[in-house]
Amino acid sequence: MSEAVKNLVNNDLADVMFNRHSVRQFDPNVKIGRDELQKMIAEAATAPSACNLQSWHFVVVDTPEAKAKFKQAVMKFNYPQVDSASAIVFIAGDTQSHYVYRDVWNKVYEDGNITKERLDQILGTFLPLYENATPDFLKFDATIDCSVVGMQLLLVARAHGYDANAFSGIDFEKMIPTLGLDPKRYVPVMGIAIGKAAQEPLHTTRYDAKTQTDFLA
């Protein structure tokens, strides 16, 4: 049993996934320690990413002072969850993640997970793609990575016995500077509020997946 599994309160995938609901009002008396928040982030970061670039960056907002600053770039209808959540984990996309691309894949090689031939193939194929990519490509690519890790963090929070809600009701121009990050490097993606629900969450329905699915002929 891995150390990550030992951290989980709920290891029932069906319950974690299908009984997950968005919570917007949390018990303000519940505090999640930073060690546990860091564990949850590490567990979420096992999510897949394009070319294993892991183009995400997490900013944890968990003090009254940090929340006051954070709210300067948040739409007012999201204030209740920001104020009541134990923590908000904001996920920003890193458009310069490829700068350490060689380091990432050299580590994979050094760990014995790929051959030298495969390493050379990866670096020769994918690194030039990112080095010559347009800014829009890098933003879209990082946003996809962040969306995947964000969904995983929602599930990890549930597995730790907490509730969560993903939100993007923010000022996209102000958020990155508000977080103290470089706007030339990072793009805002989403915030995830984590805590214990103070009330029964709204149970929503889903469209019939058949109406949203096509099979290419």
UniProtKB/Swiss-Prot annotation:
<dbReference type="GO" id="GO:0000166">
    <property type="term" value="F:nucleotide binding"/>
</dbReference>
<feature type="binding site">
    <location>
        <position position="169"/>
    </location>
    <ligand>
        <name>FMN</name>
    </ligand>
</feature>
<protein>
    <recommendedName>
        <fullName>CLA biosynthesis enone reductase</fullName>
        <ecNumber>1.3.1.-</ecNumber>
    </recommendedName>
</protein>
<comment type="function">
    <text>Is involved in a saturation metabolic pathway of polyunsaturated fatty acids, that detoxifies unsaturated fatty acids and generates hydroxy fatty acids, oxo fatty acids, conjugated fatty acids such as conjugated linoleic acids (CLAs), and partially saturated trans-fatty acids as intermediates. CLA-ER catalyzes the saturation of the carbon-carbon double bond in 10-oxo-(11E)-octadecenoate to produce 10-oxooctadecanoate, during linoleate metabolism.</text>
</comment>
<keyword id="KW-0216">Detoxification</keyword>
<feature type="binding site">
    <location>
        <position position="78"/>
    </location>
    <ligand>
        <name>FMN</name>
    </ligand>
</feature>
<dbReference type="Pfam" id="PF00881">
    <property type="entry name" value="Nitroreductase"/>
</dbReference>
<feature type="binding site">
    <location>
        <position position="165"/>
    </location>
    <ligand>
        <name>FMN</name>
    </ligand>
</feature>
<comment type="similarity">
    <text>Belongs to the nitroreductase family.</text>
</comment>
<dbReference type="GO" id="GO:0016491">
    <property type="term" value="F:oxidoreductase activity"/>
</dbReference>
<keyword id="KW-0547">Nucleotide-binding</keyword>
<keyword id="KW-0520">NAD</keyword>
<keyword id="KW-0288">FMN</keyword>
<comment type="subunit">
    <text>Homodimer.</text>
</comment>
<feature type="binding site">
    <location>
        <position position="168"/>
    </location>
    <ligand>
        <name>FMN</name>
    </ligand>
</feature>
<dbReference type="GO" id="GO:0009636">
    <property type="term" value="P:response to toxic substance"/>
</dbReference>
<feature type="binding site">
    <location>
        <position position="81"/>
    </location>
    <ligand>
        <name>FMN</name>
    </ligand>
</feature>
<feature type="binding site">
    <location>
        <position position="118"/>
    </location>
    <ligand>
        <name>10-oxooctadecanoate</name>
    </ligand>
</feature>
<keyword id="KW-0285">Flavoprotein</keyword>
<dbReference type="InterPro" id="IPR029479">
    <property type="entry name" value="Nitroreductase"/>
</dbReference>
<feature type="binding site">
    <location>
        <position position="206"/>
    </location>
    <ligand>
        <name>FMN</name>
    </ligand>
</feature>
<comment type="pathway">
    <text>Lipid metabolism; fatty acid metabolism.</text>
</comment>
<dbReference type="InterPro" id="IPR000415">
    <property type="entry name" value="Nitroreductase-like"/>
</dbReference>
<feature type="binding site">
    <location>
        <position position="22"/>
    </location>
    <ligand>
        <name>FMN</name>
    </ligand>
</feature>
<dbReference type="GO" id="GO:0006631">
    <property type="term" value="P:fatty acid metabolic process"/>
</dbReference>
<feature type="binding site">
    <location>
        <position position="51"/>
    </location>
    <ligand>
        <name>10-oxooctadecanoate</name>
    </ligand>
</feature>
<feature type="binding site">
    <location>
        <position position="24"/>
    </location>
    <ligand>
        <name>FMN</name>
    </ligand>
</feature>
<keyword id="KW-0560">Oxidoreductase</keyword>
<feature type="binding site">
    <location>
        <position position="20"/>
    </location>
    <ligand>
        <name>FMN</name>
    </ligand>
</feature>
